[in-house]
Amino acid sequence: TGTVSPAGGNLKEPVTENTKKVARCFYALEQERADRKRYPAVNPIDSYSKYLEYPEFQEYIAGHISPTWIDKVNEIKTRMLRGKEISEQINILGDDGVPVEYHVIFWKSELIDFVILQQDAFDAIDAVTPLARQEFMLNKVVKICHAEFKFNTFLEVMEYFKKMINIFKQMNYSEYESEQFKKFNDQLDALIAEREDK
């Protein structure tokens, strides 16, 4: 286990770089995420786990969770990176300066962030997530990321995904497979059907 606290959060300085060479798993804590109240404040792009590359680990995950789990984890990391790139373009060009499709990609990455990566440690249910629940939520989010949606303006995109994220958050606070959980899941399915371009 290696722990580094680089000055100014600079992850490129020599001690951090050398620690990363020997560490199998690296959590990059980020002040910006903490300031935005996105907890745990772990940067999903700079963080990594080399265990995903180990055949023994891959075999265990395939047998205990799903054969497609690691592929989905890698996919959402790629989507997070694409979302960050688009966020930077929006900051430079403005909301009207990028196509509506870019806003959809950005908000799909926000969906991943809010639903899969963020966690409320003060909530008894959200603080501890069983593997079966993780698999269900990951599959649900990945399915939405694969779906095509129809929007005319970036405001429609933002309002739609904020509504979706809110329902997901309520699911995160509900006991897995409870009536309340199923109710929110049904609401999500109805919301997806409203805009999905089939």
Regions picked out by a protein language model, each given a short descriptive name:
Residues T1-K169, E177-Q180, N185:
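P-loop NTPase catalytic core
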Residues Q187-K198:
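C-terminal accessory/interaction regions of large nucleic acid-associated machines
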